[in-house]
Amino acid sequence: MARTTPIERYRNIGISAHIDAGKTTTTERILFYTGVSHKIGEVHDGAATMDWMEQEQERGITITSAATTAFWSGMSQQFPQHRINVIDTPGHVDFTVEVERSMRVLDGAVMVYCAVGGVQPQSETVWRQANKYEVPRIAFVNKMDRTGANFLRVVEQLKTRLGANAVPLQLPIGAEENFTGVVDLIKMKAINWNEADQGMTFTYEEVPANMQADCEEWRQNLVEAAAEASEELMEKYLGGEDLTEEEIKSALRQRVLANEIILVTCGSAFKNKGVQAMLDAVVEYLPAPTDIPAIKGINPDETEGERHASDEEPFSSLAFKIATDPFVGNLTFFRVYSGVINSGDTVLNSVRQKRERFGRIVQMHANKREEIKEVRAGDIAAAIGLKDVTTGDTLCAIEAPIILERMEFPEPVISVAVEPKTKADQEKMGLALGRLAQEDPSFRVHTDEESGETIISGMGELHLDIIVDRMKREFKVEANIGKPQVSYRETIRTRVNDVEGKHAKQSGGRGQYGHVVIDLYPLDPEGPGYEFVNEIKGGVIPGEYIPAVDKGIQEQLKSGPLAGYPVVDLGVRLHFGSYHDVDSSELAFKLAASLAFKAAFSKANPVLLEPIMKVEVETPPEYVGDVIGDLSRRRAMVNGQEANEFVVKIDAEVPLSEMFGYATDLRSQTQGRASYSMEPLKYAEAPTSVAAAVIEARKK
């Protein structure tokens, strides 16, 4: 089968925004104008095509990034047909991992901003992720029909808050309820969309007289941005010559691809205006797979390799999302970087060194699917029934193995205990959690050895709510959630010598007798955690009982004398004791050892250790004082801050127990404009008052 669309006409783009900037509605309109969906889905009535999980339609927020293929030939059919693969990404801070993984497989992005709200906090986080992966982007200022809409204010915020070199491609005609269309600054024509056919057709008209001067000024700004692409154009421009439309467009494209400028378009997706011109901008300015650098990877011999976007190169692809589908089981979304694959072919998962057979391949249109026989470089598709693939794995040709750059996923930061409501739910819950953990690398499940409870960990409180919600809906498992947990530890600070433990029951018949004398001493936290030294001389305790002494102490370490938490970082020296020919046994020595350990532990200055998190907060400069003040109240140690003019990064170490509810508090202190990440750093001694409260709570 030959390629239907040349790879130069592919656009793999993400649509990214803050919650409520109208991203899903914008995506819906793209699907409508590109002829994929015949009825426009509205988020307002829970019918949007891209939001396909029930919860998304209820909450009106997008959680999973669905990938959809659409075709576009331009507003006035001025291009050959282009294939646009759209990845819809969530805008909520708890789902940053979803945004991160879609940025990894995109070539370009459309950043959607609300004309009223402007550049909001999550937009700053998403912007930083796009910078990290060097994704070329354009902006679409949506909701121009809303009260308080102000296009140029948003352009200004792109410059001041994000440090973007924002260059408007259009100016809006009117605003709020008087918003009627846009002026194309390259053509210097007004575009008016026909409301009768939901904006499918439009007319070019003269620029309104009252906008002429403004449009001239902004066109000058645009042409100058284009001229900076090369010395020849700059000379032509400075010499007073006009640049042709073709020259302007190709120069702007060059600068967008180099991440030097952000072109800004505007409209109202809800009112069917502007999305059509934004699609033209996607085709004209965002990269094809051939415009971006070859993807890097590691060859089997550990040297660096790469794959170019070409059908001729060996097959390589990256699995970027696993989704569970009610009808076909696992869907593995993957992006093809090079080569061709047919359904039925076998490939290598080079990360796990396992072979996988591509049974069926489907191209997704939101939640509808079309079976296809082959995929080629540049395609994004989903495979059904791959056995052992997780997010971030490379699938490649068996004869040309390579491991493509992996995605990095943050460590989970919050844990809660879950228990099934009924016995019947028990087994189903294990299955459901395993399935969900496979889909989402930032979600983990483990069993707490101390309490036997099932603990789930994730990126935030909303993240875990949604996991529990999905268990209920998709797997019909009802579960109760506990309070967020902190795992403390216990240890000692001073050495104690010659503490004895004696277990003796000798009242006629076979008795029990064990007697040990031990020293207890602290170990370095970087060390083994526990050591046992046997220094018995002259057989005062026979060799066969020594392991029982060690075992008796190790059993005590699982649940410490202070508050029942695991004991770490201590050593035991066994150096004296006594035994009885008849009455001594392994059990008696085990019990004697545990008595000696408890007695020694209480004398060795026992302390409670708490987990300390490494916390990084990124905040606009005006909130630094509030953020640091709040961190100090949480017993934080602030290690330093780095600033540029848009954002200050604060590094701190904070006890985990003080971080519950932090996301909500940080949001309210900074009007939602700051973001934070945290990961486990170390254990440190808890202050006396904190330790006393924890110990007290455990006794209840």
UniProtKB/Swiss-Prot annotation:
The GO molecular function terms of this record are: GTP binding; GTPase activity; guanosine tetraphosphate binding; translation elongation factor activity
What's the domain of life for this entry? Bacteria
Residues binding GTP are 17-24, 88-92, 142-145
Q: Which Pfam families match?
A: EFG_C (PF00679), EFG_III (PF14492), EFG_IV (PF03764), GTP_EFTU (PF00009), GTP_EFTU_D2 (PF03144)
What CDD domains does this protein map onto? EF-G, EFG_III, EFG_mtEFG1_IV, EFG_mtEFG_C, EFG_mtEFG_II
Q: Name one GO cellular component term.
A: cytoplasm
Alphabetically ordered keywords of this record: Cytoplasm, Elongation factor, GTP-binding, Nucleotide-binding, Protein biosynthesis
List where in the cell it is found. Answer: Cytoplasm
Ranges for domain tr-type G come to 8-290
**SUPFAM superfamilies the UniProt entry points to:** EF-G C-terminal domain-like, P-loop containing nucleoside triphosphate hydrolases, Ribosomal protein S5 domain 2-like, Translation proteins
Q: Which InterPro entries match?
A: EFG_II (IPR041095), EFG_III (IPR009022), EFG_III/V (IPR035647), EFG_IV (IPR047872), EFG_V (IPR035649), EFG_V-like (IPR000640), EFTu-like_2 (IPR004161), G_TR_CS (IPR031157)
Record-level GO BP terms: ribosome disassembly
Q: What is its main location?
A: cytoplasm
Q: Which PANTHER family match?
A: RIBOSOME-RELEASING FACTOR 2, MITOCHONDRIAL, TRANSLATION ELONGATION FACTOR G-RELATED
NCBIfam families named among the record's database cross-references: EF-G, PRK12740.1-5, small_GTP
The family annotation for this protein states: Belongs to the TRAFAC class translation factor GTPase superfamily. Classic translation factor GTPase family. EF-G/EF-2 subfamily.
Q: What does this protein do?
A: Catalyzes the GTP-dependent ribosomal translocation step during translation elongation. During this step, the ribosome changes from the pre-translocational (PRE) to the post-translocational (POST) state as the newly formed A-site-bound peptidyl-tRNA and P-site-bound deacylated tRNA move to the P and E sites, respectively. Catalyzes the coordinated movement of the two tRNA molecules, the mRNA and conformational changes in the ribosome.
Instruction: Tell me the protein's name.
Output: Elongation factor G
Q: Which organism is it from?
A: Haemophilus influenzae (strain 86-028NP)
The gene it comes from is: fusA
